Structure formats: C-alpha cells, structure tokens
Amino acid sequence: MSRTMVIMAGGTGGHVFPGLAVAHRLQADGWNIHWLGTPDRMEADLVPAHGFPIEFINIRGLRNHGLVRKLLAPFQICKAVLQAFMILRRIRPDVVLGMGGYAAGPGGVAAKLLGIPVVLHEQNAAAGLTNRLLAKIATRILMGFEGAFPLTERSRVVGNPVRDEFLQLAQKPLKKYHTGNPLKILIVGGSLGARPLNQIVPHALAKLNNIDVRHQSGKGNASAVSDLYQSLGVTTVTVTEFITDMAAAYEWADLLICRAGALTVAEVAAAGIPAVFVPLPHAVDDHQTRNAESLTRRGAAVLMPQKEMTADKLAELIAQWQVDPRQLQKIAQLSRAAAILDATDRVVSECKALI
C-alpha cells in the first residue's frame, strides 16, 4: 500500500531544500509526496520544478508589519487553517512534515484537527516563531542542532538534510593543505548578497599574496564588486552574481567566508571545508550566530561577528593560515567530523515510525 506525505515548507531555501531532500528520498521508497506552500514565495516555482504537486494557502508573516495587518491576523490565520484543512482532508496524508515557513503553521494545526501525525523539523539552532507554536501540538520534534528545543521523549537531534551533491562531496577525501600553494578563497554572501562581505572582504584580500578568489556578490552587485577588486589591485578573482553549482565551488575552495544559515552550516560540515562565519546580525533571535557556534565551539570553524570584522583582522587571520596551513587541515577534519551525513535518513525514519 502506497503511503502519502504532505510537506509544509516555504519562503527560503533553508526550509525548501531540506524538504526536497526528504521528498526525493521518500519518493524513491514509493511514497506519494504533496507540498503545502504559499503562492508568492520560492516554493511556488521550485517544488513543481522537482516534480512534486503543490497546494497553496494564503498566509503571510506577522513580524515587522503595521497595526492593521496585526489586527487582521487572527482572521487571516483562521482562513488559512480552513484552507489547509480542506486540502489535507482531500489528500488524506498518513503524516505531515513541517519544515518551516508561513504555510507550516496553519497546515500543522489543520493536520492536528484531522488526527494526522505532525512531524516538525527545526533547521536552526534557535527555533522560529512558527515552530515554537507548532511544537506544542507536534507528534515528533526534530532538530538540526541541539538546543533548538529541550530534549524530551518527543524530540530528537537528527541534523539538517543536505542536497545529494553535498553528500557525494562528503565521500571524497579532505583536501591537503601545503605551504606555498595559492589559497583558494570562496566568498558567499547569500543569493541576495551581503553588503559587508562585498565591501570589507576585498579590502582584506588586497593585503594578501598568493591567493585565488571566487566571490558571489548577489544580484546586481557583480560589476561594483569586480571594480572594487580591480581598484585594489586584486587580479586573481572571479566575481559572479550567483553560483549555480555550489557543491563544485565548495570542492574548489580551500577556505569559505560566508553567512551562517542552517543549510550553509550543514553543507560546510558535509564538505569538510574550513569556514569563517559572519552571521547576519539582524537575523531573528540571532539564530545564525547559534548555528555557527555548533561548529565553532568544536574548533571546526571560525566565528567573526560582523561588528568586529575589519579588513585588517580578516587579513591577519588568513595570513596566519597561509604560514601554517596545518591549522586549516585541522579545521577541515573537525568540520567533517561534526557532519550528520544521514540526516535525511533520520528524518525519513522518524516519519515512517509514526504510521
């Protein structure tokens, strides 16, 4: 008998890509997969592109909005729960999996009303508002990092599912770091870029010799960032708005400078690449700092808060590694050791156990 799951996730790649990893694994096991999302976020296009049917409900976030929207919020939430209720009653899934995003809240409530097991997965080290509320009614609570929720009989640390190309990368031997080789540095500020990385990192790298640089600048920033490198005399650099094959870029790099989204941290560990994390300072509940600390407290990465990052400080750190690349080798080993490479299988197993 074929089983059915509804995955509730959307808004950002940090929610959608782990959900897709689980979806593909369950589909390979013969499951029917449906998706619940919102029509104006990235899941609307990305999920169908992966071959999964998607249903939409109308719901928006409540943070940082005006009084009128907050006053209307109870009515909008009730409407969204009703929409989700009707969709789930029609699909009749055996279990629902909430991976975060606006649709997960109403979807989880509707599933609970219908008596459908609710599995919750929190990718970040600090749980988001939707998941904190859903945790009260969830059948099972899964965590990417320890500390997002208290460990109880309902909760488990399972890690964050990553894309297959990163799992393949994790099977390859770690790089060997040697003095004298050009240090290959990858800068990733997210798909929309990160202004401090675009502005400060070029000044830091201009103070170094024997480097090769690839820099993802974000949409509309490539020309300005490229011009900045050129004005600073850095010639061994390639600047692009967006890197389509991130796993290949990680495999190329000796060192990564990036933000600390949950998916990024999981992919860094799987790849076994030394990273300097510069957490987004205004992330909700400072969750990026806590994500980064899952590696930095093990010595498996370096944390550099944005307010403390200067060109001189970053250049000095990298120069130390150029003199003694054994430090990078040790960080790479600790990073790979921290990876939970079977996270997708763990999530799948927890979902199957509830049927």
From Swiss-Prot:
Entry's EC annotation: 2.4.1.227
Any one Gene Ontology cellular component term annotated for this protein: plasma membrane
Main location: membrane
Gene3D superfamilies, per the entry: Glycogen Phosphorylase B
UniProt keyword annotations, A-Z: Cell cycle, Cell division, Cell inner membrane, Cell membrane, Cell shape, Cell wall biogenesis/degradation, Glycosyltransferase, Membrane, Peptidoglycan synthesis, Transferase
MF terms in GO: UDP-N-acetyl-D-glucosamine:N-acetylmuramoyl-L-alanyl-D-glutamyl-meso-2,6-diaminopimelyl-D-alanyl-D-alanine-diphosphoundecaprenol 4-beta-N-acetylglucosaminlytransferase activity; undecaprenyldiphospho-muramoylpentapeptide beta-N-acetylglucosaminyltransferase activity
Coiled coil ranges: none
Stated family: Belongs to the glycosyltransferase 28 family. MurG subfamily.
Protein name: UDP-N-acetylglucosamine--N-acetylmuramyl-(pentapeptide) pyrophosphoryl-undecaprenol N-acetylglucosamine transferase
Underlying gene: murG
